């Protein structure tokens, strides 16, 4: 394999690993949020917060030269998964 391509792929592998660990950490925190919401009888979803987050992160994507539509799709996927976890926590 070409050495340049090998270095690119190693960088991608490292970034992918970092993404997985960051997502794991994020889900630990959102799990705690879900448990808090369940014990305090709060709704699993907060549409206002979600929209503020999407708007903020779309701007970050623009600042980072990343497609904001892609970023929003990715984040909505994560948010939907978090809400599913919060709904499960509420059900017990």
Predicted regions and their residues:
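Domain-level signature for soluble enzymes in the chorismate/prephenate branch of the shikimate pathway
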Residues: 1-92
